């Protein structure tokens, strides 16, 4: 999910294009016949449908196309690595990498989250192999030394030079714009510089990978991330967040003070405490300081600033973005017990995102055939598929929690808009106007949102098929056979949502039959939608049969 200078000649130097600010009137224009290369499909009321037919299978098909492309469809570069291990972006025809700073921590964290949802959905174990490949590479080539004299030991770098085998932050002077009156540094963070919020994001990815695979190296990597974050948490204010946005890994010298992306870090600390890993008192202390700041500042003043690694350095937190706000809203919707005011906070975030990033810009309309299309950040206001899909997924979760029908409609139309960014090859572009291709925007931070949407609104999953859509745990094994679904979860207590092609007559957990019930251990089945909900206690293995 990079920001500036995406769309021009990926194989050559990329030139930044300043996006318009929200609130500017879009020029009148005729309805175009196509969106991102696909003919526009509308319903009888002129509202946007997906380009995929049949419509009811659109989101599952987009996921299949894009995952298949990622798993099988990219070349090996001159450095011996597949494109997605060394480049942020790629050419639309050759699929070879482009000359812009790589953002591995963001990409790999998103891929782990997406794979942990797509594996139970599909049963395709290749995505687990991909998780191992990207994480093993970054552990070996993108991690600070385990040297206690370093301020940030044993944690991931967020960025790298394009084509580099080793990630150490990018040499930012290589990516300064040649036509700037003075060089604007900071793109790719700078050599030796890391981003603490990505320590939290990829730390959470490592923890999820441990749950998926049982590999203790990933648990230990997550522990190192949590310890570094707890050690460096600080009081925040309107100009300084609990962790800086950019910091020199060896010395701890701060390069940029403010970053509001706390959702993944809060969840990492929550999970470390829940699982009894490491120092619970330290996790609680760090979490409390971060949470208090989040409530006092971004949740109150809407300064959701800084996330993207390829933006130049700014002296103050003026580059607002929807990513940090949207992921904070997701955290609250998935864990409402953490915040008594979750309804007010999430409603505020969703309204702010729609007003600030769903409005018209100089180049693009904010509402297209009834779909709210979301821009990325103040410094780059192009409408993008991944960010529109994030908005859709959070709206779907809000609908699930509140039964708000307008949120469901917004989610549906925005998801439909986002499908247009994926072509029949499974190549996903950033957006219809900003048409470059990124592994973050097209895969890591795109696919996971469709999975979240189908989990929140199960009737959006393909009918007449069998799919495990969501679990409160991590699903470590799944097996589909005609008239049967079997799965195993990491936690011995949890809830799952499935869409089935058959009416279940037998649901067992740990070999013990569950009873149909709306509350407590058991299951409920909606025959009109084919939706099964399982609630289990003291059991990891579930089998469903007709």
Model-assigned labels for residue ranges:
Residues 27-106, 125-185, 223, 228, ...:
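Low-complexity, Ser/Thr/Pro/Gly-enriched N-terminal "stalk/linker" regions
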Residues 27-80, 133, 178-183, 187, ...:
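Terminal, non-catalytic domain-edge segments
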Residues 79-102, 149-193, 239-264, 302-329, ...:
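Carbohydrate-binding/catalytic loop surfaces
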Residues 100, 106-121, 133, 203-208:
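Non-membrane alpha-helical segments in proteins
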Residues 189, 193-196, 200, 205-210, ...:
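Solenoidal tandem-repeat scaffolds enriched in leucines and small polar residues
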Residues 488-505:
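Surface-exposed beta-strand/loop patches in extracellular or lumenal glycoproteins
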Residues 496, 521-546:
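C-terminal beta-strand-rich structural cap/linker in extracellular carbohydrate-active enzymes
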